[in-house]
């Protein structure tokens, strides 16, 4: 299986991916349910920084030098309640669209975005090649067919544009989401039942309904299939939350499933 090293192809992002950043994101994880503004606000700002660096390193070269997100047509698939839209606006990006299927999720934080479109990632309501950059952040593990969603994202990405696909790997410590760090290793059903017994209500992410087993190998194989078909080029694959000196984990079968936690695939459409 062919893999591209992010350490050589994404130098700007590599410099940003420090241990301090990783520890800060890790510290925020415990606030996902109790203080979503803090958790998702910081995550959204970090996501904008990641995409800005990826676009600078792997996007089109302009007469002014490296590409900027300003003026770039961006689609966020599964953008949720608006934290990401706010972060893009704060960064000066005004050509951002988010597509979210759940009305309740869209309104959860009380954030109103004129650029929000209700629709399914499995059947995106956009024309072919409509966007320069499409991305999905922590959505793939919540849909029953993540690779159909990825195909849809690639469809609406223009040739030469980028698709960034980031998702939580099931066998990583956060694969079970709010159900705990180890319970999902026993099984998704067990983790959900134990959570409900402990907290008196079922988890937000329900095993087999809105939470699924997606592996690192699944994503890397998908990227390889796209390359073999000539549909896209794998620009890079790396662990989203790790410092750059730990990005080598994506190359080691077995270890990557438990050590990567969240895999990022950067694909350039051909």
PLM-predicted stretches and their roles:
Residues 103, 138-139, 241:
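Short, flexible loop/turn elements at secondary-structure junctions
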Residues 144-152, 158, 162-266:
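S-adenosyl-L-methionine-dependent methyltransferase catalytic module, highlighting the catalytic core
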Residues 100, 141, 152:
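Acidic-residue sensor for enzyme active/binding pockets
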Residues 133-144:
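A short SAM/SAH-binding and catalytic strip from SAM-dependent methyltransferases
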Residues 122, 140, 171:
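Adenine-nucleotide cofactor-binding loop residues
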Residues 1-123, 135, 259-264:
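Conserved N-terminal segment of class I S-adenosyl-L-methionine
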């Amino acid at each position: 299986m062919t893999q591209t090293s992010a350490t050589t192809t994404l130098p700007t992002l590599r410099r940003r991916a420090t241990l301090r950043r990783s520890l800060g994101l890790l510290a925020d994880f415990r606030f996902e349910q109790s203080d979503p503004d803090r958790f998702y606000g910081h995550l959204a700002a970090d996501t904008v920084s990641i995409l800005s660096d990826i676009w600078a390193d792997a996007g089109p070269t302009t007469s002014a030098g490296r590409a900027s997100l300003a003026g770039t047509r961006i689609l966020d698939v599964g953008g949720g309640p608006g934290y990401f839209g706010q972060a893009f606006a704060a960064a000066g990006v005004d050509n951002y669209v988010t597509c979210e299927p759940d009305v309740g999720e869209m309104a959860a934080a009380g954030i109103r975005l004129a650029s929000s479109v209700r629709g399914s990632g499995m059947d995106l309501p956009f024309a072919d090649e409509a966007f320069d950059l499409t991305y999905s952040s922590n959505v793939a593990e919540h849909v029953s067919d993540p690779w159909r969603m990825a195909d849809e994202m690639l469809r609406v990405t223009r040739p030469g544009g980028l698709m960034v696909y980031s998702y939580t790997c099931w066998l990583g410590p956060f694969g079970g989401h709010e159900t705990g760090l180890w319970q999902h290793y026993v099984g998704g059903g067990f983790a959900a039942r134990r959570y409900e017994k402990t907290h008196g209500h079922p988890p937000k992410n329900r095993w087999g309904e809105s939470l699924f087993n997606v592996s690192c190998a699944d994503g890397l194989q998908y990227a390889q299939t796209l390359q073999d078909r000539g549909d896209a080029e794998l620009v890079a694959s790396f662990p989203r939350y790790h410092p750059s000196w730990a990005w080598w984990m994506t190359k080691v079968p077995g270890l990557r499933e438990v050590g990567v936690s969240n895999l990022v695939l950067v694909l350039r459409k051909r």
